[in-house]
């Protein structure tokens, strides 16, 4: 009797660690493979003041709150230019909303949309990535499921910290066999005042944006002295040009730690970027508004 062939879709037969070793091995190549890109960046943000008291207006990152209004919404449409290793130049072409500026979470909102998923840290060096060279010391991994065609499998792998720490995150990722690149990653974490969930979807295998994010979804809850603020941000990127490095000139050295952000990120606005109504966005919005979001605009405009 012939030995039975192992089922490639049986997650219980797979070692998450052996898959992750390959993903972690390739991460430094993929981290620095992009030299330059230009993209249209759309961001939609919503904020709900679940609980508030008079202290809320002293939070430095908070926008101006209107009396009796708990929910706010804002959209922006920008040109984003990235130059390696980590210089981002964002020019806002159009913005509309029931407030004149985004709520910046912990003052670092742009970084939630500038994640290099293959870097050893996530979000401004605060968090150790489950793809870091030393990640296996701090994270445990598990194969949840196997998807796709037999010659083009994708593995859904969950990760969780081995010990409690604000520097570690939990969540899951989907990785592609053969190339060992990431299709999407969900990670959640917390600091003293902020809890967040971040979903990043990457381009497809073989496409020019394979190693770049195409969609972000960030949920955060901020708690401070009796105030509770919920926020949700969705971002979509549409790449116009992508320049990859010549692989023969790349080495496996990690990029140096992020330097002072004031040097690496600039945000400018067209003088007439702010729109007085939301109709302009109808033509450029990549993600339609929900009925509730339309109502927020109707009440405001």
PLM regions: where:
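Structured extracytoplasmic
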Residues: 2-154, 162-168, 225-301
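A conserved hydrophobic secondary-structure block that centers on an alpha-helix together
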Residues: 149-154, 160-172, 176, 181-188
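Extended lipid/amphipathic-ligand handling interfaces
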Residues: 171-173, 177, 198-209
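Beta-strand-dense domains in secreted/periplasmic systems and polymorphic toxin scaffolds
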Residues: 185, 214-216
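A short acidic/small-residue loop/turn micro-motif
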Residues: 189-191, 219-220
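Extended non-globular scaffold/tether segments
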Residues: 193, 207-208, 212, 222-224, ...
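A short, polar/charged loop-to-alpha-helix boundary motif
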Residues: 194-198, 229
């Amino acid at each position: 009797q012939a030995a039975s062939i192992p089922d490639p879709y049986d997650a219980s037969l797979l070692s998450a660690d052996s898959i992750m070793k390959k993903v972690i091995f390739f991460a430094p190549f993929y981290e620095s493979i992009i030299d330059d890109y230009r993209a249209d960046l759309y961001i939609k943000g919503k904020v709900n003041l679940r609980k508030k008291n008079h202290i809320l207006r002293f939070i430095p990152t908070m926008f101006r709150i209107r009396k009796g209004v708990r929910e706010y919404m804002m959209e922006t449409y920008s040109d984003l230019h990235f130059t390696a290793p980590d210089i981002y130049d964002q020019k806002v072409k159009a913005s509309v909303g029931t407030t004149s500026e985004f709520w910046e979470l912990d003052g670092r909102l742009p970084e939630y949309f500038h994640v290099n998923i293959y870097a050893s840290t996530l979000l401004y060096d605060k968090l150790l990535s489950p793809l870091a060279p030393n990640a296996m010391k701090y994270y445990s991994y598990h194969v949840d499921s196997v998807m796709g065609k037999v010659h083009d499998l994708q593995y859904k792998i969950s990760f969780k910290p081995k010990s409690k720490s604000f520097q570690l995150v939990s969540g899951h990722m989907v990785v592609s066999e053969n190339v060992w690149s990431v299709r999407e990653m969900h990670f959640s974490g917390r600091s003293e005042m902020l809890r967040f969930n971040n979903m990043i979807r990457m381009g497809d295998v073989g496409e020019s944006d394979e190693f770049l994010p195409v969609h972000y979804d960030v949920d955060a809850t901020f708690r401070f002295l009796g105030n509770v603020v919920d926020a949700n941000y969705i971002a979509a990127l549409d790449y116009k040009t992508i320049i990859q490095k010549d692989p023969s000139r790349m080495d496996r050295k990690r990029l140096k730690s992020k330097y002072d952000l004031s040097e690496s990120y600039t945000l400018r606005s067209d003088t007439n970027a702010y729109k007085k109504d939301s109709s302009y966005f109808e033509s450029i919005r990549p993600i339609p508004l929900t009925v509730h979001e339309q109502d927020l605009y109707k009440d405001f405009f």
